[in-house]
């Protein structure tokens, strides 16, 4: 990160240490697949560099869409990995005649449907729906009414409380962001327009994120069951669903329909990515269990493990296979792509800094 700041190939200062595990994840999986720590570090570094560049690319739209996010970018590879997909799908949807009229956002739903459009009500509705779907027959639904209603209330509470909690996080982290930016500006003389890289957790409380995530939870489970060739059933991974959308919403401008369609497509494809990476993920988990005896990573015999976050990302899948499956040729391609993106980003940063100084 420091080298990229010095060479003006990024303007993001990444202090989101909590999410460094994403880079460690792809590096670890490559390490266990190749049995080489050097290949693992290579994959992690490539992932990190491209993530910082994507954070720069999305920063302006991110800051323009969300409130109180000036000077902040999101260098989290799980979020960033879906940006190219979102840009392409969003352009395709814009070209469909009449589709632009389906401009539905979370606030618009509130105005149009009143109580029915409130995130609280939608949470209750989706929670009760998931609870009912878990029952085998009508009699079981009747017997489990207290459980179903309880799940609905919990989902509704999540929809209502997460935005409020998120706003408290923003208030608490904003001074840290401002102080870090001032400190870095002093150390890097002439640096203009630096952004502080922070966790997407700051914005997962956006109503559109909550609405689309809750709608996609049952859809993703259904896709996992019906898609031919998929062998991954997401359970605990569903908690990571919220992190798909922080950088997609600025592209769709908060349109719930567009965001849902993009989420549907990327998650359907992502299930196949997880299935493909599962053997390598499982190998890594077995090694960890052998050394730590931690029951949390003990995958039973006859099963394979996977994770929606970060293994479903096209970003991690592409880096893994170019490094592992194609070795030197694939790695050469990754280096060329990364250098090309760094040069483009440097030109953009220099142009931006000249504009700011003038």
Task: Show the residue positions of the predicted features.
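Signature of multi-pass transmembrane helix bundles
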Residues: 1-195, 250-255, 288-358
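Hydrophobic alpha-helical bundle architecture
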Residues: 5-13, 196-280, 284
């Amino acid at each position: 990160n420091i080298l990229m700041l010095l060479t003006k190939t990024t303007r993001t200062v990444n202090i989101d240490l909590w999410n460094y595990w994403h880079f460690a994840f792809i590096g670890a999986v490559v390490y266990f697949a190749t049995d080489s720590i050097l290949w693992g570090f290579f994959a992690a570094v490539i992932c990190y560099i491209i993530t910082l560049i994507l954070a720069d690319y999305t920063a302006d739209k991110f800051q323009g869409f969300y409130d109180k996010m000036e000077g902040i970018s999101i260098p989290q590879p799980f979020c960033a990995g879906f940006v190219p997909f979102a840009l392409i799908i969003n352009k395709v949807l814009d070209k469909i005649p009449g589709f632009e009229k389906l401009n539905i956002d979370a606030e618009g739903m509130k105005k149009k449907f009143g109580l029915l459009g409130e995130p609280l009500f939608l949470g209750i509705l989706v929670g009760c729906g998931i609870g009912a779907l878990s029952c085998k027959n009508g009699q079981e639904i009747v017997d489990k009414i207290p459980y179903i209603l309880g799940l609905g209330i919990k989902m509704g509470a999540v929809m209502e409380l997460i935005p409020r909690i998120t706003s408290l996080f923003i208030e608490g982290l904003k001074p840290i962001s401002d102080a870090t930016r001032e400190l870095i500006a002093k150390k890097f003389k002439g640096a203009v327009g630096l952004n502080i890289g922070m966790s997407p957790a700051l914005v997962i409380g956006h109503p559109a994120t909550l609405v689309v995530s809750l709608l996609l939870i049952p859809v993703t489970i259904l896709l996992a069951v019906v898609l031919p060739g998929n062998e991954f059933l997401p359970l605990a991974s569903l908690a990571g669903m919220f992190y798909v959308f922080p950088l997609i919403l600025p592209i769709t401008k908060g349109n719930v329909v567009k965001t849902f369609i993009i989420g549907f497509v990327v998650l359907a494809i992502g299930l196949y990515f997880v299935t493909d990476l599962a053997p390598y993920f499982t190998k890594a988990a077995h090694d960890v269990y052998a050394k730590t005896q931690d029951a949390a990573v003990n995958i039973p015999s006859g099963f394979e493990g996977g994770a929606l976050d970060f293994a479903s990302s096209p970003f991690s899948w592409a880096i893994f296979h170019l490094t592992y499956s194609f070795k030197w040729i694939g790695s050469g391609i990754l280096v060329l792509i990364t250098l090309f993106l760094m040069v483009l980003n440097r030109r953009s940063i220099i142009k931006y800094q000249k504009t700011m100084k003038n």
